[in-house]
Amino acid sequence: MGQKVHPIGIRLGITKDWNARWYADSKNYSDFLISDIEIRKELNEKLKHASVSQINIERVANGVRVTIHTARPGVVIGKKGEDIEKLKQALIAKTGMPVNINIEEIKKPELDAKLVAEGIAQQLEKRIQFRRAMKRAVSNAMRLGAQGIKVNVSGRLNGAEIARAEWYREGRVPLHTLRADIDYATFEADTTYGKIGVKVWIFKGEKLEKISMVSDDKKQSKGKKGRK
C-alpha cells in the first residue's frame, strides 16, 4: 500500500526552508533540540489567539533569534510592546540565553495553510456545517490568488455515529511536482462529538524560474570561457 510523504518535508532545500537554523556538535545537539521544542510550546500556549502560522528559530553566537509569523502582529506586540517584552523575558528564563524576537506580518492569511486549517477548525467548534466552512475557505483562497487548494476533514462529521472523511478541492494541487510551492498544515477541532481533523494543501505556483535563470547564466559563462 502506498504511503503519503509530508508535502513540506520532501521540499526542504528545494522550495521550502527549515524552521530551525543552527549547527551543533553531538554533545549539544539534544539540548538545543529540546530547547527549541520548549520555545515553540511556550509561544504556542501564550499566543493561542494571535493567528501564529510559523515560528523560526536561529542560534547565533551566544543568543537565540526567534521570528514569529503572524496575521495579527498587534496582538503579539501588545500595548506599547508590553506583551512582546514579557514573552522575551519568559524565553530568556527558559533558555538561559539572550533572546531576540522579530515579528513578521502575514499579509494574506487566506493563503496560509495553518491559518486556514485553524479557521475551519474554529468554525466546526461553533457548530457551523463542515461543507460550508470548507467551501468558504476554498473560495477565499482562490479569490486571493491561489492556483489550487484542497481541504480534508475527518471524524464524526455533523455528529454522525460513524466517522468518515470528506474533501473538497478547487484548482490543481500537484503534490508530485517538487518545484511546486505547496503549503500544508493540519489542525484539530474539539467538538462535543470528539475531535475532527482538518488538513489543508494550498498550491501557490512553481518556483523554478529563479533557479533556471541562474543555471542559464552559468551555462553562458562556461560557454564564453570555452571559446577563449
Swiss-Prot record:
Segments spanning the bilayer are none
Q: What is the protein named?
A: Small ribosomal subunit protein uS3
Coiled-coil-forming residues are none
Q: What does the sequence similarity comment in the record state about its family?
A: Belongs to the universal ribosomal protein uS3 family.
KH type-2 domain boundaries: 39-107
How is this protein organized at the quaternary level? Part of the 30S ribosomal subunit. Forms a tight complex with proteins S10 and S14.
Q: Which GO terms describe its molecular function?
A: mRNA binding; rRNA binding; structural constituent of ribosome
What the entry lists under Gene3D superfamilies is as follows:
3.30.300.20, Ribosomal protein S3, C-terminal domain
Record-level GO BP terms: translation
Q: Which UniProt keywords apply?
A: Ribonucleoprotein, Ribosomal protein, RNA-binding, rRNA-binding
Write down the SUPFAM superfamilies for this protein, in alphabetical order.
Answer: Prokaryotic type KH domain (KH-domain type II), Ribosomal protein S3 C-terminal domain
Biological function: Binds the lower part of the 30S subunit head. Binds mRNA in the 70S ribosome, positioning it for translation.
Q: Organism's domain of life?
A: Bacteria
